[in-house]
Each structure stands twice: as C-alpha cells, then as structure tokens.
Amino acid sequence: NIFLLIFCLAGCGTSGTGTSESGTEQQESSSAAPNYYHKGKIFLPQADGKVTEEHEGVKLDLSHTDQGYFMAAYTGSADKLLIQVEGSDNIPYRYYFDPDGKYNALPLTAGDGSYAVTAYENVGDNRYAVVFTKIVDVTLENEVLPFLYSNQYVNFDENTKTVALAKKLTKGKTEIEAVQEVYEYVIKNIVYDDEKAATVKSGYLPNVDDTLKTK
C-alpha cells in the first residue's frame, strides 16, 4: 500500500514551470516526451464505448489503450469474474470483479506490444473456467501513461484525500522537488502494515486514503 500511495501522491501533484539557467521558462518540445506531471490534472479513465467487446456478460472497453489502460465490467451469472492481463513481459496480472456492471480500469504496464486478456468465471470455491481470451495490440502515446491513470489497484478521483494532499505537498515544486517532498512525507508519516500484508486475502483491493491513516 505504501508504494501505491507514493504512486498516487507523485502522479497527482501540481507544480510550477521549471526554469533554465538563464531564468527563462523551459518550453515543452513536441518531439520530446511530454511532461505529464505537476499540471494539476487528475488522470481519470473513461469507458467511451468507441471500441468494445462483450462475451457472456464480460464487457471490455478498449477505446483508450493508447493511454495505457482498458475498462472492464461484468454482468454475468457467476459470483466472481477474474481477468488476467499478460503483456510482453510475461507477467500475469489478475483482477477480480463482482457481477455489478461497474467498470474498472486495468493498466497496460508492459509497454507497447500484444497483451493476452483472458476472462475466467468462478465455478465454485477457488475454481475458475475460461470464458474467452482476446489479444489486444497496444501502442502507447507515452510509456508513463499506464502509471498515471486511476485504476482498480490505485483508485482515486477529485475527492480523494490523497489527491488533495499531493497538490498541497507539491505546489510550486519542480518535478524533482515534488518527488523528494512525497518521499520525505511517506517515510516520516506512513508505517508498513506487516499484519495486513501477512493476512490479506485474494481479491483484496488497496485504498490509498486508508493508507494515509497507517501512521
């Protein structure tokens, strides 16, 4: 949870424009990687319905894979749905859904390339049966985007207390200063919850605001 908090605090901050040695403002170059940090923008995912797939109650919205995420929801008859996402790094990430029809964002953290998205329905106890597998080809607008958007594991919006704290900590700071400020805050104020780490159950979803309370 501490690492998720650092992610949210650093990614949701805002700061002033950097200056060069001559004191002039640094201009963004269209050919360089865009500076996505410290502009006060909250990166919230959307299910626009422009590119969709649906199989047996499993809904995928693939409208924004270039932004480093896709949306998924479940309205089927099983008690649980498991979606596994595996990219070119061959690391499978698993996400659990209730049959409530609510969309959640799933990040595409392995960069450009093909991702295998496999949906499994719970058929009893810890047993799951395959519903379908889809190959999703991804070309990111920028490699940092999968780590900036709110998603199922790092869930935040404009009303999240962590976002408000991030803006407060990083106001007027350069990018490097903002990272340092967040780092100092976390090591001084947040304690790793060893008991929770040892007893957490499958399907647990972190809450970044709850992490703020673990002092």
What are these regions (language model features)?
Residues 182:
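Conserved hydrophobic/aromatic pocket- or pore-lining residues that grip, position, or stack substrates
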Residues 175, 185-215:
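Active-site neighborhood of thiol-dependent amide/isopeptide-bond enzymes
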Residues 179:
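Short, well-ordered surface patches within globular domains
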Residues 1-4:
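Sec-dependent signal peptide recognition
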Residues 8-11:
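C-terminal motif of bacterial Sec signal peptides marking the signal peptidase cleavage site
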Residues 13-176:
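N-terminal accessory/pre-domain segments preceding catalytic cores
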